[in-house]
Amino acid sequence: MSQKTVKVQLVRSLIGTREDHRATVRGLGLRRLNSVSELQDTPAVRGMINKVSYLVKVLA
């Protein structure tokens, strides 16, 4: 059975954000504005997305 995945896109700039939020975005594999990362859909990843939900958009 294949793992479920989720695609995340960085849609807002990291300028002026908290340092731990920047680290969370880097942990999601996002570097530049509009970059997309495909990750396994786990509770840890969901928590990271929830923490920086004002910066990212979930695509799938």
Swiss-Prot record:
GO terms classed as biological process: translation
Record CDD domains: Ribosomal_L30 (cd01658)
Keyword Ribosomal protein in annotation: yes
Record keywords, A-Z: Ribonucleoprotein, Ribosomal protein
GO cellular component, one term: cytosolic large ribosomal subunit
Molecular function in Gene Ontology: structural constituent of ribosome
Subunit structure and binding partners: Part of the 50S ribosomal subunit.
Matching NCBIfam families: rpmD_bact
Family: Belongs to the universal ribosomal protein uL30 family.
The protein's name in its UniProt record: Large ribosomal subunit protein uL30
Source organism of the structure: Cupriavidus metallidurans (strain ATCC 43123 / DSM 2839 / NBRC 102507 / CH34) (Ralstonia metallidurans)
